[in-house]
């Protein structure tokens, strides 16, 4: 088995999907989890205005609405959380995403004060954060807020990770990578667009340039610029297509060096890191 085949198998990626079937699969998956643990009453997700959180948010709201109708449990709710750092440049996209999702509840937690306070506390301890590390601080602060909300609403935190993100490890460890349940796992980027199109999402929300937008020195830095490959390259790789060797090597390089992000904390029984 080639490394490409191993990666495809590990991430559950498929070359072709039926969008309607995958929508139903994700919604039923979320519902089944909540039904298994009836003490859980909410799904919590940060909404950024980008493709991934818009899709995960819509699927979460659909799952909650269906489960509420089926069980009569009106305590069930989907909580969409806005988590800007100060003023977000693409705030209108966030509002458009909220309008499309129509969540049961919307909360806004501005993380700037908490991030600056943490940075100052570290500075007083003799640690000056780089812009890159400060970006990770933002991602972790966002997740901390979501877990606090979930803790107070008997909820679980929904993740936005998918195959095209997992393969490169393009997420913050214990930030946006630290979630309870990931309904998009297995899908590549273009497949996520297919699901949103099938759901009637406004096109600008899934055709916009993907960006983590974490670094102050490089605001709105496109994911593809940071990775050195395009999402079309990554999707083609995940669909089993043959790529230019240099591009394939870059993708596989990301996969190998970010393996630790896709695993639980390393123990004496692990040996993947010895490769």
Swiss-Prot record:
UniProt binding sites for deamido-NAD(+): 140, 173, 180, 260-261
SUBUNIT field: Homodimer.
Protein name: NH(3)-dependent NAD(+) synthetase
Binding site for Mg(2+): 52, 165
Function: Catalyzes the ATP-dependent amidation of deamido-NAD to form NAD. Uses ammonia as a nitrogen source.
GO terms for MF: ATP binding; glutaminase activity; metal ion binding; NAD+ synthase (glutamine-hydrolyzing) activity; NAD+ synthase activity
UniProt-listed Pfam families: NAD_synthase
Binding positions for ATP per the UniProt entry: 46-53, 160, 189, 211
EC number of this enzyme: 6.3.1.5
Signal sequence region: none
């Amino acid at each position: 088995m080639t490394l490409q085949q191993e990666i495809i198998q590990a991430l559950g990626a498929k070359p072709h999907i039926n969008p309607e079937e995958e929508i139903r699969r994700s919604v039923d998956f979320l519902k089944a989890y909540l039904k298994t643990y009836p003490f859980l009453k909410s799904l919590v997700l940060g909404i950024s205005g980008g493709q991934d959180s818009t899709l995960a948010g819509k699927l979460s709201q659909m799952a909650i609405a269906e489960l509420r109708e089926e069980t009569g449990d009106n305590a069930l709710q989907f909580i969409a959380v806005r988590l800007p750092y100060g003023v977000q440049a693409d705030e209108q996209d966030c509002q458009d995403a909220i309008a499309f999702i129509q969540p049961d509840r919307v909360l806004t937690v501005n993380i700037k004060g908490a991030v600056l306070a943490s940075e100052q506390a570290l500075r007083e301890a003799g640690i000056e954060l780089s812009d890159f590390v400060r970006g990770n601080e933002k991602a972790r602060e966002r997740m901390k807020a979501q877990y606090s909300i979930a803790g107070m609403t008997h909820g679980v935190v929904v993740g936005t990770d998918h195959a095209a993100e997992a393969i490169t490890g393009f997420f913050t460890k214990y930030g946006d990578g630290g979630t309870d349940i990931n309904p998009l796992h297995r899908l590549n980027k273009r497949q996520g667009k297919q699901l949103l199109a099938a759901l009637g999402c406004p096109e600008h929300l899934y055709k916009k340039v993907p960006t983590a937008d974490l670094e102050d020195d490089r605001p709105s830095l496109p994911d593809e610029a940071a990775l050195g490959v395009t999402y079309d390259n990554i999707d083609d790789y995940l669909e089993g297509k043959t790529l230019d060797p240099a591009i394939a090597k870059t993708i596989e390089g990301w996969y190998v060096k970010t393996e630790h992000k896709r695993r639980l904390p390393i123990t004496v029984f692990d040996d993947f890191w010895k490769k």
